[in-house]
């Protein structure tokens, strides 16, 4: 062997190490494809094809019952009698937000209507908010209601200078003094 052939064997490796075993596939010649598995071009079509008319087969999106992807709908209702209140509850069940203007009703009927719709809203875990005089907002659980007045009450208030002078000073805690630590 020449020096070049030895170098070639070392760098390229031996042919018997590079032989791919098991790459030959065994086929059974006894089975012929049936007409149902052949497509128009004569090739074999997959048996469990996802194109069997299922429109959601290629999509990973799973629909949730009762929830639509359409825009949220807000209904403004001005009932004249209590008899119109079941329509309000049905709209809430259909996940629609309701603005209920009760200025057209008598005060006792309006109170009864608000109690009825508030009970229905509570039953579906919805939200209710008073918007104005005899005007109420009822929303299903899928709608978040935030008011500016609740944000203002959560914000710290600034006391006036006169209030600061009259406000009593908070007592210092006993556990924070030096005498309490030394005993």
Curated annotation (Swiss-Prot):
Question: GO biological process annotations for this chain's record?
Answer: division septum assembly; FtsZ-dependent cytokinesis
* Main localization (coarse): cytoplasm
- Keyword field: Cell cycle, Cell division, Cytoplasm, Septation
Describe the subunit structure.
Homodimer. Interacts with FtsZ.
Give compartment(s).
Cytoplasm
Q: What does this protein do?
A: Cell division protein that is part of the divisome complex and is recruited early to the Z-ring. Probably stimulates Z-ring formation, perhaps through the cross-linking of FtsZ protofilaments. Its function overlaps with FtsA.
Q: Where is this region: Disordered?
A: 149-183
This entry carries the following GO cellular component terms, namely: cytoplasm
- Recorded superkingdom: Bacteria
Similarity section: Belongs to the SepF family.
**This chain belongs to which protein, by name?**
Cell division protein SepF
